């Protein structure tokens, strides 16, 4: 999103009984759709956009950072895309169990020691990952995951709130800008 704004994140009103919203931002729920279905439309659309950006190919290995609602939706979409393996990494046992029931591999994340799951990822994917999708908005976690990608690997971020901490070093950012300029 170019101008991220969300009630309860960076706009007050998430717990208000009533809230005033611009009419352009309000949509009627069709009679054929339940409230529960309508409630996840925004999350599902962001996840579909992320899958489009990743452009998963048959036989690829993809890692999802985070097992919140977006991570769980993404895992299912990517599993259906034909990727060789989809692995979700999170810290909540109940969510990891749910993903396992959907046929998705999982890695238990240790928020106090990222090297634990980093070693597990390297063991499972010794040649690196084709793509990583970040749903955590954790600069520390994301910065450690770049080295887990294969050459030409892709990383997509769909954080639930803006990240204000730079993840890339100035040198890495300069190199990315040079590569982008060369390719365009």
Regions found by a protein language model. Give the residues of each.
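N-terminal Rossmann-like NAD(P) cofactor-binding module of classical short-chain dehydrogenase/reductase
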Residues: 130-133, 156
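Helix N-cap at the beta1-alpha1 junction of Rossmann-like dinucleotide-binding domains, i.e.
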Residues: 92-94, 111-113, 139, 162-163
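Mid-domain Rossmann-like dinucleotide-binding core that forms the NAD(H)/NADP(H) cofactor-binding site
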Residues: 33-111
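Short amphipathic alpha-helix with an adjacent loop that forms part of the alpha/beta core around
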Residues: 113-127
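Short, glycine/polar-rich helix-capping loops at beta-to-alpha or helix-loop-helix junctions
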Residues: 14-15, 90-98, 163-170
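Glycine-rich phosphate-binding loop and adjacent beta-alpha segment
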Residues: 83, 101, 139-184
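Glycine-rich helix-loop-beta junction characteristic of Rossmann-like nucleotide cofactor-binding loops
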Residues: 52-57, 125-126, 147
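Glycine-rich phosphate/adenylate-binding loop and adjacent beta-alpha elements
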Residues: 1-26
